[in-house]
Curated annotation (Swiss-Prot):
[4Fe-4S] cluster binds at C350, C410, C413. SUPFAM superfamilies: Aconitase iron-sulfur domain (SSF53732). This is 3-isopropylmalate dehydratase large subunit. Its cofactor is [4Fe-4S] cluster. It comes from Sinorhizobium medicae (strain WSM419) (Ensifer medicae). Keywords: 4Fe-4S, Amino-acid biosynthesis, Branched-chain amino acid biosynthesis, Iron, Iron-sulfur, Leucine biosynthesis, Lyase, Metal-binding. The gene is leuC. InterPro entries: 3-IsopropMal_deHydase_lsu, Acnase/IPM_dHydase_lsu_aba_1/3, Acoase/IPM_deHydtase_lsu_aba, Aconitase_4Fe-4S_BS, Aconitase_4Fe-4S_dom, IPM_dehydratase_rel_enz, IPMI_cat. GO terms for molecular function: 3-isopropylmalate dehydratase activity; 4 iron, 4 sulfur cluster binding; metal ion binding. Pathway: Amino-acid biosynthesis; L-leucine biosynthesis; L-leucine from 3-methyl-2-oxobutanoate: step 2/4. Binds 1 [4Fe-4S] cluster per subunit. It is an enzyme of class 4 (lyase). Catalyzes the isomerization between 2-isopropylmalate and 3-isopropylmalate, via the formation of 2-isopropylmaleate. Pfam families: Aconitase (PF00330).
Length: 469
Protein backbone atom coordinates (compact mmCIF):
# COMPACT_ATOMS: atom_id res chain seq x y z
CA UNK A 1 0.00 0.00 0.00
CA UNK A 2 1.38 3.43 -0.96
CA UNK A 3 2.12 6.05 1.68
CA UNK A 4 -0.54 8.70 2.36
CA UNK A 5 -0.13 11.74 0.11
CA UNK A 6 -1.05 15.40 0.35
CA UNK A 7 -3.08 17.15 -2.34
CA UNK A 8 0.16 18.73 -3.58
CA UNK A 9 1.85 15.33 -3.73
CA UNK A 10 -0.98 13.91 -5.83
CA UNK A 11 -1.00 16.68 -8.42
CA UNK A 12 2.80 16.64 -8.61
CA UNK A 13 2.92 12.87 -9.11
CA UNK A 14 0.23 13.01 -11.81
CA UNK A 15 2.31 15.50 -13.83
CA UNK A 16 5.83 14.21 -13.28
CA UNK A 17 7.49 13.48 -16.63
CA UNK A 18 11.02 12.84 -15.40
CA UNK A 19 13.20 13.32 -12.32
CA UNK A 20 16.95 13.48 -11.71
CA UNK A 21 18.99 12.31 -8.74
CA UNK A 22 19.50 15.91 -7.56
CA UNK A 23 15.73 16.48 -7.35
CA UNK A 24 15.41 18.36 -10.63
CA UNK A 25 12.11 17.38 -12.23
CA UNK A 26 10.25 17.90 -15.48
CA UNK A 27 6.53 18.61 -15.02
CA UNK A 28 3.80 18.59 -17.65
CA UNK A 29 1.82 21.85 -17.74
CA UNK A 30 -1.92 21.70 -18.42
CA UNK A 31 -2.70 25.40 -18.77
CA UNK A 32 -0.64 28.46 -19.66
CA UNK A 33 -2.01 31.97 -19.16
CA UNK A 34 -0.20 34.80 -20.92
CA UNK A 35 -0.33 38.60 -20.56
CA UNK A 36 1.41 41.49 -22.29
CA UNK A 37 4.20 42.26 -19.80
CA UNK A 38 6.12 38.99 -19.42
CA UNK A 39 5.46 37.39 -22.81
CA UNK A 40 7.00 39.54 -25.61
CA UNK A 41 10.55 38.23 -25.17
CA UNK A 42 9.26 34.66 -24.84
CA UNK A 43 7.39 34.78 -28.15
CA UNK A 44 10.34 36.49 -29.80
CA UNK A 45 12.56 33.65 -28.59
CA UNK A 46 10.26 31.15 -30.31
CA UNK A 47 10.28 33.23 -33.47
CA UNK A 48 14.09 33.42 -33.58
CA UNK A 49 14.43 29.67 -32.96
CA UNK A 50 11.77 28.82 -35.55
CA UNK A 51 9.60 27.05 -32.98
CA UNK A 52 5.82 26.84 -32.69
CA UNK A 53 3.66 27.01 -29.58
CA UNK A 54 3.37 23.33 -28.72
CA UNK A 55 -0.20 23.42 -27.38
CA UNK A 56 -2.00 26.63 -28.39
CA UNK A 57 -5.32 25.15 -27.25
CA UNK A 58 -3.90 25.02 -23.70
CA UNK A 59 -2.72 28.63 -23.85
CA UNK A 60 -4.84 31.75 -23.29
CA UNK A 61 -3.64 35.34 -23.79
CA UNK A 62 -5.20 38.39 -22.13
CA UNK A 63 -4.21 42.06 -21.84
CA UNK A 64 -4.55 43.40 -18.31
CA UNK A 65 -1.53 45.15 -16.75
CA UNK A 66 -1.10 48.07 -19.15
CA UNK A 67 -4.60 48.70 -20.46
CA UNK A 68 -6.33 51.96 -19.47
CA UNK A 69 -9.48 51.59 -17.39
CA UNK A 70 -10.97 54.98 -18.33
CA UNK A 71 -14.18 55.06 -20.41
CA UNK A 72 -12.26 56.50 -23.38
CA UNK A 73 -9.75 53.67 -23.56
CA UNK A 74 -10.95 52.83 -27.07
CA UNK A 75 -8.98 55.89 -28.17
CA UNK A 76 -5.77 54.00 -27.49
CA UNK A 77 -2.93 53.74 -24.97
CA UNK A 78 -0.96 56.95 -24.45
CA UNK A 79 2.17 55.42 -22.93
CA UNK A 80 4.39 54.17 -25.75
CA UNK A 81 5.95 51.25 -23.87
CA UNK A 82 2.54 50.02 -22.72
CA UNK A 83 1.11 50.36 -26.22
CA UNK A 84 4.01 48.40 -27.72
CA UNK A 85 3.52 45.56 -25.23
CA UNK A 86 -0.22 45.33 -25.91
CA UNK A 87 0.29 45.42 -29.67
CA UNK A 88 3.00 42.76 -29.38
CA UNK A 89 0.67 40.38 -27.53
CA UNK A 90 -2.05 40.79 -30.17
CA UNK A 91 0.46 40.13 -32.94
CA UNK A 92 2.08 37.18 -31.15
CA UNK A 93 -1.25 35.54 -30.36
CA UNK A 94 -2.27 35.81 -34.03
CA UNK A 95 1.09 34.56 -35.31
CA UNK A 96 1.20 31.54 -33.00
CA UNK A 97 -2.51 30.61 -33.01
CA UNK A 98 -3.21 31.44 -29.36
CA UNK A 99 -6.68 32.56 -28.26
CA UNK A 100 -6.53 36.23 -27.29
CA UNK A 101 -8.89 38.56 -25.41
CA UNK A 102 -8.25 42.19 -26.41
CA UNK A 103 -9.50 45.22 -24.49
CA UNK A 104 -12.53 45.37 -26.82
CA UNK A 105 -13.58 41.80 -25.93
CA UNK A 106 -16.02 41.63 -23.01
CA UNK A 107 -14.22 38.48 -21.82
CA UNK A 108 -11.08 40.57 -21.28
CA UNK A 109 -9.97 41.27 -17.75
CA UNK A 110 -7.32 40.41 -15.22
CA UNK A 111 -5.85 37.09 -16.28
CA UNK A 112 -6.46 35.44 -12.88
CA UNK A 113 -10.14 36.38 -13.00
CA UNK A 114 -10.60 35.43 -16.64
CA UNK A 115 -9.18 31.90 -16.32
CA UNK A 116 -11.72 30.73 -13.71
CA UNK A 117 -14.59 32.59 -15.42
CA UNK A 118 -13.99 30.71 -18.65
CA UNK A 119 -13.59 27.29 -17.04
CA UNK A 120 -10.00 27.32 -18.31
CA UNK A 121 -8.93 26.71 -14.70
CA UNK A 122 -9.86 23.22 -13.49
CA UNK A 123 -9.04 21.05 -10.44
CA UNK A 124 -5.98 18.84 -10.52
CA UNK A 125 -4.27 20.84 -13.25
CA UNK A 126 -0.85 22.43 -13.36
CA UNK A 127 -1.26 26.09 -14.32
CA UNK A 128 1.43 28.69 -14.93
CA UNK A 129 1.62 32.33 -15.96
CA UNK A 130 4.35 34.93 -16.03
CA UNK A 131 2.78 36.56 -12.98
CA UNK A 132 3.28 35.83 -9.29
CA UNK A 133 -0.43 35.89 -8.45
CA UNK A 134 -1.06 32.79 -10.54
CA UNK A 135 -1.43 31.18 -7.10
CA UNK A 136 -5.05 32.42 -7.30
CA UNK A 137 -6.02 29.35 -9.35
CA UNK A 138 -5.02 27.08 -6.47
CA UNK A 139 -8.48 27.79 -5.06
CA UNK A 140 -9.72 25.12 -7.48
CA UNK A 141 -7.31 22.46 -6.26
CA UNK A 142 -4.90 23.23 -9.10
CA UNK A 143 -1.13 23.54 -8.72
CA UNK A 144 -0.69 27.09 -9.98
CA UNK A 145 2.25 29.47 -9.70
CA UNK A 146 4.11 32.25 -11.45
CA UNK A 147 7.07 31.75 -13.77
CA UNK A 148 9.75 33.98 -15.31
CA UNK A 149 9.93 35.07 -18.93
CA UNK A 150 12.50 32.41 -19.90
CA UNK A 151 10.19 29.80 -18.38
CA UNK A 152 7.26 31.28 -20.31
CA UNK A 153 9.20 30.56 -23.49
CA UNK A 154 10.03 27.03 -22.29
CA UNK A 155 6.36 26.25 -21.56
CA UNK A 156 5.22 27.74 -24.88
CA UNK A 157 7.72 25.54 -26.71
CA UNK A 158 7.46 22.28 -24.73
CA UNK A 159 4.35 22.41 -22.49
CA UNK A 160 6.68 21.38 -19.65
CA UNK A 161 8.57 23.10 -16.85
CA UNK A 162 11.78 22.25 -15.02
CA UNK A 163 11.63 22.66 -11.24
CA UNK A 164 12.22 21.03 -7.88
CA UNK A 165 9.48 19.89 -5.56
CA UNK A 166 8.61 22.17 -2.66
CA UNK A 167 7.81 21.15 0.91
CA UNK A 168 4.25 20.69 2.16
CA UNK A 169 2.71 23.24 4.51
CA UNK A 170 -0.78 23.18 6.02
CA UNK A 171 -2.59 26.31 7.17
CA UNK A 172 -5.80 25.33 8.93
CA UNK A 173 -8.38 27.94 9.87
CA UNK A 174 -10.79 26.39 12.35
CA UNK A 175 -14.26 27.61 13.25
CA UNK A 176 -16.54 30.17 11.63
CA UNK A 177 -15.72 33.75 10.71
CA UNK A 178 -17.44 36.45 12.78
CA UNK A 179 -19.67 38.99 10.98
CA UNK A 180 -17.66 41.60 9.06
CA UNK A 181 -14.60 39.37 8.71
CA UNK A 182 -13.82 38.10 5.22
CA UNK A 183 -11.49 35.97 3.14
CA UNK A 184 -9.20 39.01 2.77
CA UNK A 185 -8.90 39.24 6.53
CA UNK A 186 -8.06 35.53 6.70
CA UNK A 187 -5.12 35.79 4.33
CA UNK A 188 -3.85 39.05 5.83
CA UNK A 189 -3.99 37.41 9.27
CA UNK A 190 -2.09 34.38 7.97
CA UNK A 191 0.64 36.56 6.46
CA UNK A 192 0.79 38.57 9.68
CA UNK A 193 1.26 35.30 11.57
CA UNK A 194 3.88 33.60 9.38
CA UNK A 195 5.52 36.67 7.81
CA UNK A 196 6.34 37.26 4.17
CA UNK A 197 9.03 34.57 4.32
CA UNK A 198 6.99 32.07 6.33
CA UNK A 199 6.02 29.94 3.34
CA UNK A 200 9.38 30.05 1.56
CA UNK A 201 10.18 26.71 -0.06
CA UNK A 202 6.65 25.40 0.55
CA UNK A 203 3.33 24.92 -1.18
CA UNK A 204 0.55 25.83 1.25
CA UNK A 205 -2.67 23.87 1.51
CA UNK A 206 -5.46 25.86 3.15
CA UNK A 207 -8.01 23.82 5.09
CA UNK A 208 -10.38 23.98 8.04
CA UNK A 209 -14.03 24.88 8.56
CA UNK A 210 -13.56 28.59 7.80
CA UNK A 211 -11.91 27.82 4.46
CA UNK A 212 -14.53 25.24 3.46
CA UNK A 213 -17.25 27.78 4.26
CA UNK A 214 -15.87 30.29 1.77
CA UNK A 215 -17.34 30.76 -1.69
CA UNK A 216 -15.06 30.12 -4.66
CA UNK A 217 -14.45 33.84 -4.93
CA UNK A 218 -13.40 33.97 -1.28
CA UNK A 219 -11.10 31.01 -1.80
CA UNK A 220 -9.51 32.77 -4.76
CA UNK A 221 -8.80 35.78 -2.54
CA UNK A 222 -7.02 33.55 -0.02
CA UNK A 223 -4.93 31.69 -2.59
CA UNK A 224 -4.18 34.91 -4.49
CA UNK A 225 -1.99 36.22 -1.67
CA UNK A 226 -0.17 32.96 -0.97
CA UNK A 227 2.85 34.48 -2.69
CA UNK A 228 2.84 37.37 -0.19
CA UNK A 229 3.32 34.72 2.49
CA UNK A 230 6.46 33.51 0.71
CA UNK A 231 5.04 30.27 -0.71
CA UNK A 232 5.24 29.22 -4.35
CA UNK A 233 1.61 28.17 -4.53
CA UNK A 234 -1.54 27.75 -2.46
CA UNK A 235 -4.11 24.95 -2.69
CA UNK A 236 -7.63 24.27 -1.50
CA UNK A 237 -9.09 20.81 -2.11
CA UNK A 238 -12.03 20.89 -4.55
CA UNK A 239 -15.53 20.08 -3.29
CA UNK A 240 -19.16 20.59 -4.28
CA UNK A 241 -18.70 24.37 -4.06
CA UNK A 242 -15.91 24.07 -6.63
CA UNK A 243 -17.90 21.83 -8.96
CA UNK A 244 -20.96 24.11 -8.86
CA UNK A 245 -18.82 27.12 -9.80
CA UNK A 246 -17.17 25.35 -12.75
CA UNK A 247 -20.21 23.60 -14.23
CA UNK A 248 -21.45 25.12 -17.51
CA UNK A 249 -18.47 27.48 -17.84
CA UNK A 250 -17.47 27.85 -21.53
CA UNK A 251 -14.31 25.72 -21.26
CA UNK A 252 -15.56 23.27 -18.63
CA UNK A 253 -16.07 19.61 -19.60
CA UNK A 254 -19.58 18.74 -20.81
CA UNK A 255 -21.80 15.65 -20.64
CA UNK A 256 -20.01 12.37 -19.97
CA UNK A 257 -16.67 14.18 -19.84
CA UNK A 258 -18.03 16.28 -16.97
CA UNK A 259 -19.07 13.21 -14.98
CA UNK A 260 -15.65 11.64 -15.48
CA UNK A 261 -13.91 14.86 -14.47
CA UNK A 262 -15.90 15.22 -11.26
CA UNK A 263 -15.17 11.59 -10.38
CA UNK A 264 -11.44 12.33 -10.67
CA UNK A 265 -11.69 15.69 -8.89
CA UNK A 266 -13.25 13.98 -5.87
CA UNK A 267 -9.97 12.09 -5.36
CA UNK A 268 -8.07 15.37 -5.03
CA UNK A 269 -7.79 15.64 -1.28
CA UNK A 270 -5.06 14.96 1.24
CA UNK A 271 -5.01 11.40 2.55
CA UNK A 272 -5.42 10.82 6.27
CA UNK A 273 -2.01 10.58 7.88
CA UNK A 274 -0.17 12.44 5.11
CA UNK A 275 2.89 14.37 6.27
CA UNK A 276 3.20 18.15 6.31
CA UNK A 277 6.56 19.77 6.92
CA UNK A 278 4.91 22.66 8.73
CA UNK A 279 1.44 23.21 10.22
CA UNK A 280 -0.09 26.55 11.22
CA UNK A 281 -3.50 26.77 12.92
CA UNK A 282 -5.68 29.87 13.31
CA UNK A 283 -9.02 30.28 15.09
CA UNK A 284 -11.45 32.10 12.79
CA UNK A 285 -13.51 33.31 15.75
CA UNK A 286 -10.59 35.46 16.91
CA UNK A 287 -9.99 37.18 13.58
CA UNK A 288 -10.91 40.89 13.29
CA UNK A 289 -11.17 43.09 10.21
CA UNK A 290 -7.55 43.85 9.33
CA UNK A 291 -5.69 46.86 7.90
CA UNK A 292 -2.05 46.97 6.87
CA UNK A 293 0.03 49.82 8.33
CA UNK A 294 3.50 49.47 6.76
CA UNK A 295 5.17 48.69 3.45
CA UNK A 296 5.00 44.89 3.66
CA UNK A 297 1.91 42.64 3.63
CA UNK A 298 3.06 41.24 6.99
CA UNK A 299 2.60 44.70 8.57
CA UNK A 300 -0.99 44.17 9.65
CA UNK A 301 -3.12 44.96 12.67
CA UNK A 302 -6.77 44.87 13.75
CA UNK A 303 -8.78 47.88 12.65
CA UNK A 304 -9.33 48.48 16.37
CA UNK A 305 -5.60 48.43 17.01
CA UNK A 306 -2.82 50.99 16.84
CA UNK A 307 0.28 51.46 14.73
CA UNK A 308 2.90 49.30 16.51
CA UNK A 309 6.17 50.57 17.96
CA UNK A 310 9.17 49.09 16.10
CA UNK A 311 11.34 49.60 19.20
CA UNK A 312 9.54 46.58 20.67
CA UNK A 313 11.06 44.34 17.95
CA UNK A 314 14.18 42.53 19.28
CA UNK A 315 15.84 41.99 15.90
CA UNK A 316 17.80 45.09 14.90
CA UNK A 317 17.51 44.57 11.14
CA UNK A 318 13.75 44.09 11.32
CA UNK A 319 13.39 46.98 13.75
CA UNK A 320 15.22 49.31 11.36
CA UNK A 321 13.07 48.06 8.47
CA UNK A 322 9.82 48.78 10.31
CA UNK A 323 10.97 52.28 11.30
CA UNK A 324 11.72 52.92 7.64
CA UNK A 325 8.21 51.69 6.77
CA UNK A 326 6.62 54.07 9.28
CA UNK A 327 8.66 56.96 7.92
CA UNK A 328 7.58 56.12 4.37
CA UNK A 329 3.94 55.76 5.42
CA UNK A 330 4.00 59.01 7.41
CA UNK A 331 2.74 57.32 10.57
CA UNK A 332 3.73 57.35 14.24
CA UNK A 333 3.60 54.46 16.75
CA UNK A 334 0.47 54.44 18.89
CA UNK A 335 -1.75 56.08 16.26
CA UNK A 336 -5.18 54.49 16.24
CA UNK A 337 -5.93 52.88 12.89
CA UNK A 338 -9.38 54.47 12.88
CA UNK A 339 -7.76 57.91 13.23
CA UNK A 340 -5.85 57.55 9.95
CA UNK A 341 -7.40 59.69 7.20
CA UNK A 342 -7.21 58.57 3.57
CA UNK A 343 -7.06 60.37 0.23
CA UNK A 344 -7.87 57.61 -2.25
CA UNK A 345 -9.77 54.32 -2.39
CA UNK A 346 -9.09 51.58 -4.93
CA UNK A 347 -11.49 48.64 -5.14
CA UNK A 348 -10.46 45.99 -7.66
CA UNK A 349 -7.45 43.77 -8.57
CA UNK A 350 -7.11 40.00 -8.97
CA UNK A 351 -7.49 39.80 -5.18
CA UNK A 352 -10.86 41.54 -4.86
CA UNK A 353 -12.26 42.52 -8.26
CA UNK A 354 -15.01 39.89 -8.55
CA UNK A 355 -18.78 40.24 -8.44
CA UNK A 356 -19.13 39.20 -4.78
CA UNK A 357 -16.60 41.87 -3.84
CA UNK A 358 -18.63 44.50 -5.69
CA UNK A 359 -21.86 43.35 -4.07
CA UNK A 360 -20.23 43.73 -0.66
CA UNK A 361 -19.19 47.26 -1.55
CA UNK A 362 -22.67 48.16 -2.80
CA UNK A 363 -24.23 47.09 0.51
CA UNK A 364 -21.93 49.46 2.38
CA UNK A 365 -22.23 52.53 0.15
CA UNK A 366 -25.86 52.43 -1.03
CA UNK A 367 -27.57 55.70 -0.16
CA UNK A 368 -24.33 57.29 1.06
CA UNK A 369 -21.72 59.63 -0.41
CA UNK A 370 -17.95 59.37 -0.72
CA UNK A 371 -16.29 61.82 1.68
CA UNK A 372 -15.42 65.14 -0.01
CA UNK A 373 -11.74 64.62 0.87
CA UNK A 374 -11.60 61.23 -0.87
CA UNK A 375 -11.29 60.16 -4.51
CA UNK A 376 -12.62 56.62 -4.96
CA UNK A 377 -12.60 54.23 -7.90
CA UNK A 378 -14.02 50.77 -8.56
CA UNK A 379 -12.45 48.65 -11.28
CA UNK A 380 -14.23 45.38 -12.15
CA UNK A 381 -11.87 42.46 -12.68
CA UNK A 382 -13.26 41.57 -16.09
CA UNK A 383 -15.74 42.65 -18.72
CA UNK A 384 -18.08 39.89 -17.57
CA UNK A 385 -17.89 41.10 -13.96
CA UNK A 386 -18.66 44.63 -15.19
CA UNK A 387 -21.59 43.36 -17.24
CA UNK A 388 -23.03 41.40 -14.30
CA UNK A 389 -22.62 44.35 -11.94
CA UNK A 390 -24.51 46.58 -14.37
CA UNK A 391 -27.28 44.00 -14.79
CA UNK A 392 -27.68 44.10 -11.00
CA UNK A 393 -27.63 47.90 -10.95
CA UNK A 394 -24.50 48.08 -8.82
CA UNK A 395 -22.90 50.64 -11.11
CA UNK A 396 -25.75 53.06 -10.39
CA UNK A 397 -25.22 52.65 -6.65
CA UNK A 398 -21.51 53.31 -7.07
CA UNK A 399 -21.95 56.36 -9.28
CA UNK A 400 -24.63 57.88 -7.06
CA UNK A 401 -22.29 57.45 -4.09
CA UNK A 402 -19.52 59.28 -5.95
CA UNK A 403 -17.31 56.39 -7.04
CA UNK A 404 -15.58 56.35 -10.42
CA UNK A 405 -16.82 53.23 -12.27
CA UNK A 406 -14.11 51.98 -14.62
CA UNK A 407 -13.32 49.49 -17.37
CA UNK A 408 -11.63 46.16 -16.45
CA UNK A 409 -7.89 45.79 -15.88
CA UNK A 410 -5.18 45.61 -13.24
CA UNK A 411 -5.50 49.38 -12.75
CA UNK A 412 -4.09 50.89 -9.56
CA UNK A 413 -2.88 47.60 -8.12
CA UNK A 414 0.43 48.55 -9.73
CA UNK A 415 1.77 51.71 -11.33
CA UNK A 416 1.96 50.29 -14.86
CA UNK A 417 -0.93 52.24 -16.35
CA UNK A 418 -2.66 55.60 -15.99
CA UNK A 419 -4.21 54.74 -12.60
CA UNK A 420 -1.68 55.64 -9.91
CA UNK A 421 -1.21 57.55 -6.69
CA UNK A 422 0.50 60.91 -6.45
CA UNK A 423 3.42 61.28 -4.00
CA UNK A 424 2.17 61.28 -0.41
CA UNK A 425 -1.37 60.16 -1.22
CA UNK A 426 -2.76 57.56 1.17
CA UNK A 427 -4.90 54.82 -0.37
CA UNK A 428 -7.23 52.22 1.12
CA UNK A 429 -6.77 49.41 -1.39
CA UNK A 430 -8.27 45.96 -1.90
CA UNK A 431 -5.15 44.85 -3.80
CA UNK A 432 -2.36 42.54 -2.63
CA UNK A 433 0.85 44.54 -2.22
CA UNK A 434 1.73 47.64 -0.22
CA UNK A 435 5.40 47.92 -1.20
CA UNK A 436 7.00 51.35 -1.52
CA UNK A 437 5.91 52.85 -4.84
CA UNK A 438 3.67 49.92 -5.74
CA UNK A 439 0.68 52.15 -6.57
CA UNK A 440 2.72 55.16 -7.63
CA UNK A 441 5.89 57.05 -6.68
CA UNK A 442 5.85 57.69 -2.92
CA UNK A 443 2.23 56.52 -2.73
CA UNK A 444 1.08 55.03 0.59
CA UNK A 445 -0.95 51.83 0.41
CA UNK A 446 -3.11 50.21 3.10
CA UNK A 447 -4.47 46.72 2.31
CA UNK A 448 -7.94 45.72 3.49
CA UNK A 449 -11.20 44.04 2.45
CA UNK A 450 -13.69 45.52 -0.05
CA UNK A 451 -16.29 46.34 2.61
CA UNK A 452 -13.65 48.02 4.78
CA UNK A 453 -12.37 50.03 1.81
CA UNK A 454 -15.91 51.09 0.94
CA UNK A 455 -16.62 52.24 4.48
CA UNK A 456 -13.34 54.18 4.54
CA UNK A 457 -14.35 55.94 1.33
CA UNK A 458 -17.56 57.16 2.96
CA UNK A 459 -16.04 58.08 6.33
CA UNK A 460 -12.79 59.55 5.01
CA UNK A 461 -10.80 57.39 7.41
CA UNK A 462 -10.58 53.74 8.43
CA UNK A 463 -13.61 52.43 10.31
CA UNK A 464 -14.56 49.10 11.84
CA UNK A 465 -17.05 47.55 9.43
CA UNK A 466 -18.53 45.59 12.35
CA UNK A 467 -19.86 48.91 13.69
CA UNK A 468 -21.17 50.15 10.34
CA UNK A 469 -24.84 51.11 10.45
Amino acid sequence: MSAPRTLYDKIWDDHLVDSQADGTCLLYIDRHLVHEVTSPQAFEGLRIAGRKVRAPEKTLAVVDHNVPTSPDRHLGIKNEESRIQVEALARNAADFGVEYYSESDKRQGIVHIVGPEQGFTLPGMTIVCGDSHTSTHGAFGALAHGIGTSEVEHVLATQTLIQKKAKNMLVRVDGQLPPGVTAKDIILAIIGEIGTAGGTGHVIEFAGEAIRSLSMEGRMTVCNMTIEGGARAGLIAPDETTFAYIEDRPRAPKGEAWDMAVEYWKTLHTDEGAHYDRVVVLDAANLPPIVSWGSSPEDVVSVQGVVPNPDEIPDETKRTSKWRALDYMGLKPGTRITDIAIDRVFIGSCTNGRIEDLRAVAKVVEGRKVAPTVSAMIVPGSGLVKEQAEVEGLDKIFREAGFDWREPGCSMCLAMNDDRLKPGERCASTSNRNFEGRQGFKGRTHLLSPAMAAAAAIAGHFVDIREWK
